[in-house]
A protein has these predicted regions:
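Conserved GNAT-fold acetyl-CoA-binding loop/helix
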Residues: 41-63
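A short helix-loop-beta-strand connector motif used in the catalytic cores of GNAT acetyltransferases and
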Residues: 64-79
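Short helix-to-loop capping/linker segments positioned immediately adjacent to catalytic or ligand/cofactor-binding
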Residues: 45, 67-69, 114
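Acyl-donor (CoA/ACP) binding surface of acyl/acetyltransferases
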Residues: 2-43, 77-189
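Secondary-structure boundary/capping residues
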Residues: 42, 51, 70-73, 138
Length: 189
């Protein structure tokens, strides 16, 4: 039997590195989250596209808060901050406990691209998944044209497993997707 998401509440809410702090996103972060999701550069490879208005974002973030309030969290939505400045979002969605797997996603503010933030935040979430949640596998997908995300996923040690044809409904049309994963036994970088 695996108890993959039952560690103390304080460990669930904050992840830190020497530069970044990841905290569970909430409605108090609404203005930043809406701004971040409204950038067309950020939404280019996002299947959710740009939210119509702040109320759409509010509903999403409210559902995140509901997920975070559960005793056993199944979906983590973290705000990434550098110092006091929010710079992005990263999430970990857990699958059925029997499979011990999760899927990660992230969005970084365009002004913060190419600064190693996504890589550093992803490493923190991988540590959470493998070291604390005792996952066996963490996966991620990205559009084949999303060269920045491809570099991030490979930099943290994820392995490209395959290509899904026309699986992502992007604002520009259907896109192929690369599927990546890392196992608990794989080297992490």
């Amino acid at each position: 039997v695996y108890f993959i998401n039952t560690f103390p509440l304080t460990m669930k809410t904050t992840l830190t590195s020497s530069r970044l702090t990841l905290t569970l996103a909430s409605l108090k972060d609404l203005a930043f989250i809406h701004e971040l999701q409204s950038y067309h550069q950020s939404a280019e490879f996002n299947t959710l596209a740009v939210p119509e208005n702040e109320e759409v974002t509010r509903k999403s973030v409210s559902s995140w808060e509901e997920c975070h309030a559960k005793e056993a969290i199944e979906q983590y939505h973290f705000k990434i901050s550098e110092g006091e400045n929010p710079v992005g979002l990263i999430g970990l969605n857990l699958g059925a406990a029997r499979y011990r797997r999760g899927e990660v996603w992230y969005t970084i503010h365009p002004s913060q691209w190419k600064k190693g933030i996504a890589t550093e935040a992803l490493n923190l979430v991988l540590d959470l998944g493998f070291d604390h949640l005792k996952l066996h596998r963490i996966q991620a997908g990205c559009a084949v044209g999303n060269l920045g995300s491809i570099k991030v996923l490979e930099k943290v040690g994820m392995i490209k497993e395959g290509r899904g044809r026309q699986i992502l409904p992007l604002s520009t049309g259907w896109s192929d997707n690369y599927e990546y994963s890392i196992l608990e036994s794989d080297p992490r970088k």
